[in-house]
Structures are given as structure tokens and as C-alpha cells.
Amino acid sequence: MSSCNGDCSHCSSSCSKRDKESLLEKLNPKASVKKVIAVVSGKGGVGKSTVTSLLAVAMAREGRRVGVLDADITGPSIPMAFGVNACQGADEDGLYPGLSRTGMQIMSINLLLDDPADPVVWRGPVIAGAVKQFWTDVIWEDVDYLFVDMPPGTGDVPLTVFQSIPVDGIIIVTSPQDLVSMIVGKAVKMAQMMQIPVLGIVENYSYLRCPDCGKKIEVFGKSKVDEVAQQWNLPVLARLPIDPAVAEAFDQGQMETVDTQAVDAATDAILAI
């Protein structure tokens, strides 16, 4: 390493002299983003986009200006959750994100497609490049908190986001299943490698409440989230039930009407950073 000149831009080494700042992409000069929160999961099907939407709505209700960057290029669903169908437009300065009914700024590949049902059949590097452009080319206007809805797993796009965008904290979404320990572990270890703090765990689909008697039914079996949280020294920020009303609101683009009290602790953890 004696020949290192401090220029990491043309070096593939992961030595201790590598400056993380050198990998960050510059935000669009016309944009302003104060904090970036990534919402991740080790696997698909845990309701990560629903949790992202709930957190965004809860933060907006705190009086903060909120944006949501949909980084799940091949499986985007954020526009549907908020009933957003198009961007505001573009000019020589960049691309203006779509606006939800309450003024949240939304950016997703679906807002750029002629038909939202069209598949995005791209290879990893192209997908990663698109996510970078959502940071460098989009004019996020005075955003206090930008939530990044990540694709599941620990592949190209999560790596690109963590290296290219200055993420301030990570929320891990999981569900009460046997693989939870391994899945959360992968997400935590990746966060540690990227030197990004994990704010806590949100367990989704934690239980179903019987509409007749009110009893909690553990549909996916007994939760292991407390054991996993203790293993990684992380707080459990929320236990969200299976709620048909939330699912219906998501499908109808009405997430801004949903009660968000269940994620209050997660919102507090984000506000504390």
C-alpha cells in the first residue's frame, strides 16, 4: 500500500485508506436532501414497500417534507401506493419527481414507462445506474427525509445505494419466519460493511387480529424477532399486524389515509439521528 496516492477513483482495492466519501455521487445541484433512510429486507415478500410507505406518511404527519425513492427497479410499487402516475416534468436542470396528494415527492422507474405493466428487463449494472440517476438527476425539492425503498437482498442495487448515496440510517423489515435470523444477519452485516447505522427492526405480518373476538393469531408461528434483535443488539421498532385495510389502501393508492401509530417508535428513531 506504500504506493497509494489517495485517489480511489481508479483503484479496486478495499484497503483501509479508501475514502468512503470518494464513492458518493453528487446530488443534483438544484436539489436539497437533509437525511436519507434506506428500508431494506433480506428477502422478498415481507411487505417492505408497505413499511416504507407507512414511515413516509408518518414522517410527513410530523410536519417534515418527505420524498420516496423507489430503488426496486424490477418490482416497483411505491407509485401505486400513493396513486402517483407521472413525474411533474423535466427541464435542462433535471427531472422533477411525481407528487402525492399531500405533496410527498415520489420517484420510480414506473413513472418513466409508457405502460407501468411493462417489465424492466435490464442487467444489474444498468439497473444500478438508473438508481444512481434518481439521486443525481432528480430535483428533490427541500426534502427533510428521503426514504429509499430498496429491492430485497444484498445484490447490485443495495451495494450501489450504500456506496453512492449518503445513507444516514437503515430500517430492516422482516417477518416471523424460521429464516429471520439469517435474513436479518445478512442485512446487518452488509450495513456494517458499508459503515451505516442500523436504526432497528420492523416486524411485519406479526399477527392477525380476529375480527370477531380480537384474539391475536400468529399466522406465521411464534415470532423470533426479539431473539434476533438481542443477538444483533438492535431495537424492535414495530410489530405490524396483517391488516386487510392497509393492503387495500396500498392497492388503491390511499396510503396517506392509513393510521400510522404502529410505526411511531420507528419514526422517533429516525428523528433522533
Task: List each language-model region with its residue ranges.
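Phosphate-binding/switch loop-helix module in NTP-utilizing enzymes
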Residues: L113-V161
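C-terminal lobe/tail of nucleotide-utilizing enzymes
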Residues: M1-E21, V188-I273
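Walker A/P-loop phosphate-binding motif and the immediately C-terminal alpha-helix
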Residues: K35-I73, V188
